[in-house]
């Protein structure tokens, strides 16, 4: 009897393995919340599990160069996926836009942020969280915005700099800075701020934050990887979910 139960258990394990597959995905920090929901939707629909790691695109690039077994990268920019393909680390022709990010000046304090370009220079704002523009596209967009406003030089002494947009958001969230230039997706859902107060920066003040996905060499020819990317790109519910976090498509 015990032998039969063991055989049934082993059969069940192999059956599950045959019907489901794990997909290793590296995801830019700004896309954390949407990816968690997309993963849950996809797993429910297919049984395939998304094993997502979240962090800085630059850090993922370094890991990928060192042989990390990620199959897909959802980057915070378009430059990194293009570089990955050029260097032979990714599959040619698979890098494409999955979302366009938006910048917001945000504070954890309700009714604090004013829609005024000189607000960041006011005495109310002691520290401003900004991502490193050399490492993070949202940091680059913040610098472009303040350059357009003409107040970058005066604002710089107030900067608290994060290596990526995740750390930058934490600075603003924990009041290490009164305000921060962060990704709209970190503080926005279904048409409104989820907490605090913010000013969605007009998109004509900075270059479009195009975010590309790319299939990495470990994911080449993998049917489950291709199916997941098709789901993200074409499924109406998936597209609606991404837009609900303030992204453009």
Language model segments and positions:
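Exported/periplasmic ABC-transporter solute-binding proteins
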Residues: 20-45, 51-53, 58, 62-68, ...
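Gram-negative bacterial Sec-dependent N-terminal signal peptides
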Residues: 1-19
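Active-site phosphate-binding/coordination module
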Residues: 93
């Amino acid at each position: 009897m015990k032998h039969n139960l063991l055989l049934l258990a082993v059969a069940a394990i192999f059956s599950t393995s045959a019907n489901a597959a794990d997909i290793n995905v590296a995801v830019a920090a700004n896309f954390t919340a949407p990816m968690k929901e997309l993963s849950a939707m996809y797993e429910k629909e297919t049984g395939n599990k998304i094993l997502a790691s979240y962090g800085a695109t630059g850090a993922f690039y370094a890991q990928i160069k060192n042989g990390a077994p990620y199959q897909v990268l959802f980057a915070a920019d378009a430059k990194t996926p293009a570089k990955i393909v050029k260097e032979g680390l990714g599959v040619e022709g698979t890098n494409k836009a999955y979302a366009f990010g938006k910048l917001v000046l945000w504070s954890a304090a309700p009714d604090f942020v004013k829609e005024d370009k000189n607000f960041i220079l006011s005495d109310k704002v002691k520290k401003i969280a900004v991502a490193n523009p050399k490492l993070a596209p949202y940091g680059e967009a913040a610098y472009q915005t303040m350059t357009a406003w003409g107040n970058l030089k005066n604002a710089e002494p107030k900067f608290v700099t994060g290596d990526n947009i995740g750390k930058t958001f934490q600075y603003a969230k924990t009041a290490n800075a009164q305000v921060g230039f962060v990704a709209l997706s970190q503080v926005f859902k279904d048409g409104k701020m989820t907490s605090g107060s913010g000013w969605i920066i007009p998109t004509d003040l900075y270059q479009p934050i195009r975010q590309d996905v790319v299939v990495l060499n470990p994911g080449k020819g993998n049917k489950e990887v291709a199916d997941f990317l098709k789901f993200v790109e074409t499924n109406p519910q998936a597209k609606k979910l991404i837009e609900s976090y303030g992204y453009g498509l």
